[in-house]
Amino acid sequence: MTTESIIDIHAHVFPDEIAQKATDSIAEFYSMPTRHSGTAGLLISQYDEAGISHGCIHSVALTPHYIRSINRFISETVKKYSGRLTGYAAIHPGAEDIPGLIDEVKKMGLKGFKIHPDMQKFALDDPDAMDMFGRIEGKMPIIIHTGDRRFAYSNPKRMKKVLDAFPHLTCVCAHLGGWSEWEDAWRTLASYENVYVDTSSSLYALTPEKGREMIRHYSRERVLFGTDYPMWTPMEELKRFRELHLTDDEEERILYRNAKEFLQLT
């Protein structure tokens, strides 16, 4: 497989004027340093360095107030770097007129949604969140930050309630199904055929042997490569992934083919 055939499913970008402030907030939230300021221009240069051909970008609306400005920015960024990026829209359970928002982001060329319950401070199985999932189900996919032992908002057990209620909700449970809760995640989520997982912000905390084991608990058709830029550089995450020593077929699927099909890239 050539290095030109790599897709990153999980990258965050911010407007240049607030990028450093935004990434500093992320670093504070996780008590971990970020690698870069989180601008789209720097992401593209990092992709070029790592040999990554395409990325899926998104940002999180901490309150409903920020949804539309974020989505405009993501849409404009995708257009600016035509062919290199797919955009996922921000959404929040407190948003008004979610059906209207779905229509709006489709017209903007955005292909799905992204949520981060721990930062947005809602539980996955809250009534408003369940209503949101019901309105999204069958219409657009969603990337969900799952897992964090410090909180109870997005743990695998709550995610299971969502999946049981909405069997046609196509979702990516980020960070191998549950950041810092990897064992609970695969035991709880791996059997759901509508669930994908990504590798972002997981491999740094797992030995190559454990990372390989975690990935193989899921169907190889439903694992996607993610960098979580700007938490890590694309080169760092790609190096960690290569150190897993997966089979050629597993690498090709996870680094490229699965995401190509998931994002419906031509």
Task: Annotate each language-model stretch with its function.
Residues T2-H12, I18-H54, D103, S219-L224, ...:
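Mid-to-C-terminal alpha-helical segments outside catalytic/metal-binding sites
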Residues D8, C56-S59, A90, V172-A174, ...:
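Short beta-strand segments
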Residues H10, Y47, I74, V105, ...:
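Conserved, mostly hydrophobic/aromatic
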Residues H10-D16, H116, H145, H175:
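Histidine-centered divalent metal-coordination motifs
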Residues V13-F14, D148, G178, M231:
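Short active-site segment of divalent metal-dependent hydrolases/proteases
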Residues L42-Q46, I70-T77, G100-V105, D128-M132, ...:
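A general structural detector for well-ordered alpha-helical segments in enzyme core domains, enriched
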Residues S53-H54, L62-I143, D148-R150, S191-E193, ...:
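Active-site gating/metal-coordination segments in enzymes
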Residues K111-G112, K121-L224:
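Catalytic pocket-lining loop regions of alpha/beta-barrel enzymes
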